[in-house]
Amino acid sequence: MSWQQVAIDADSRIAERFADTLMELGALSTAIEDAAAGTEFEQPIFGEPGEPVDRLWEQSRIIVLFAADADVAMLIAAAAGEAGMPTPVYTVEAVESQDWVRLTQSQFDPIRISGRLWITPTWHDAPDANAINLALDPGLAFGTGSHPTTRLCLQWLDANICGGESVLDYGCGSGILAIAAIKLGATDVTGIDIDPQAVQASRDNAVQNQVTAAFGLPDTLEDGRQFDVLVANILANPLRMLGDLLASHVRAGGRIVLSGILEEQAQELSELYSAWFEMDPPVFDEGWTRLSGVRRA
């Protein structure tokens, strides 16, 4: 079985945002490298393991992996629209499945989220046996911990889950947020996604982490069921459409956490959700936003 590998040369000022948006839209993996690699203009850049680098090359190349049947042209055009940029020039080549496994695994090293929380790929040893380690197989769903929106949500959960909460992860992807909530002390956790592959990846990752959560498609979520915490790390457009539904699943006094929102979309989404929630100030990370708030009675 083959996959589609796409190479996109991009200005480094927009490379990360564009790669992030492609992941949100269903890319299997992304990597950013020096567009001048192997030439006299190559720029070595190094960072600490588990920590994001604070700069990129002057000109970057985004390497993106898509499923064989993905509509690459449509996805790249959609990502360009979300990122507010023209559709870039790109090349596409087929790679065999064994190359995809190697390329994907080589991207994911352990990631430190906080002083006590790490994301560790299943093929790595845990870097800190005394920390809360989330063993993750990204599978075919977004949510590896390296994306700023995932990181923002994990940091909120780490700071706010006290123990015993019920949590709904709406748009669960790989299940990373639901699994983190359980390991941080939540006792009743549900994950919902529209993609059956994401649901299966979430279930597999829960087994890998030796935790129990209920993962399913949206029609498995009971109407009117309410939770102490709802986290939704999805794109701005679905968040616009789902406001009333998401609010209905948060109890009075409960908390909502939203991400997948570009910085310039934050005010609009915060104002929209203020119809149901007392909204906190937004938190930003690499051009992305986390919104949170408390459900009014």
Swiss-Prot record:
For this protein, what reaction is catalysed? L-lysyl-[protein] + 3 S-adenosyl-L-methionine = N(6),N(6),N(6)-trimethyl-L-lysyl-[protein] + 3 S-adenosyl-L-homocysteine + 3 H(+)
Query: What subcellular compartments does it reside in?
Result: Cytoplasm
For this UniProt entry, what's an example GO CC term? cytosol
Gene Ontology molecular function: protein-lysine N-methyltransferase activity
Where is S-adenosyl-L-methionine annotated to bind?
150, 171, 193, 233
Its signal peptide is none
Query: What is its biological role?
Result: Methylates ribosomal protein L11.
Entry similarity comment: Belongs to the methyltransferase superfamily. PrmA family.
Q: What is this protein called?
A: Ribosomal protein L11 methyltransferase
Protein species of origin: Laribacter hongkongensis (strain HLHK9)
